[in-house]
From Swiss-Prot:
Family: Belongs to the urease gamma subunit family.
Keywords tagged on the record: Cytoplasm, Hydrolase
Cellular localisation: Cytoplasm
Pfam families reported for this sequence: Urease_gamma
Entry EC no(s): 3.5.1.5
Highest classification ranks of the organism: Bacteria, Pseudomonadati, Pseudomonadota, Gammaproteobacteria, Pseudomonadales
Subunit and partners: Heterotrimer of UreA (gamma), UreB (beta) and UreC (alpha) subunits. Three heterotrimers associate to form the active enzyme.
Keyword Plastid assigned: no
Protein name, as recorded: Urease subunit gamma
Keyword set includes Cytoplasm: yes
Gene name, Swiss-Prot/TrEMBL: ureA
């Protein structure tokens, strides 16, 4: 299988997102990279499912709460930007204050 660098990046995000999802299910608080991967993977999947940029910008703020991440993580993530593939092309999705 010959993957482009972009495809490798998406695969890495998805894999890290799965690890984060499993840790959340066990009640483990997520650290910075896990929280980033969890939200990013959800945004990428939402785009593939046909959600709009505006819907994803809102959705990204509902995925994690302060109680689900380690202390200090919300302050480390003022925004997340993901290049997602939509049915009509690639667009940048920006989520401000993703962990409230």
């Amino acid at each position: 299988m010959d993957l482009s660098p972009r495809e490798k990046d998406k695969l890495l995000i998805f894999t890290a997102g799965l690890v984060a999802e499993r840790r959340l299910a066990r009640g483990v608080k997520l650290n910075y990279p896990e929280a980033m991967a969890y939200i990013s993977a959800a945004l990428l999947e939402g785009a593939r499912d046909g959600q709009t940029v505006a819907e994803l910008m809102h959705y990204g703020t509902t995925l994690l709460s302060r109680e689900q991440v380690m202390e200090g993580v919300p302050e480390m993530i003022p925004e997340i930007q993901v290049e997602a593939t939509f049915p009509d092309g690639t667009k940048l999705v920006t989520v401000h204050q993703p962990i409230a």
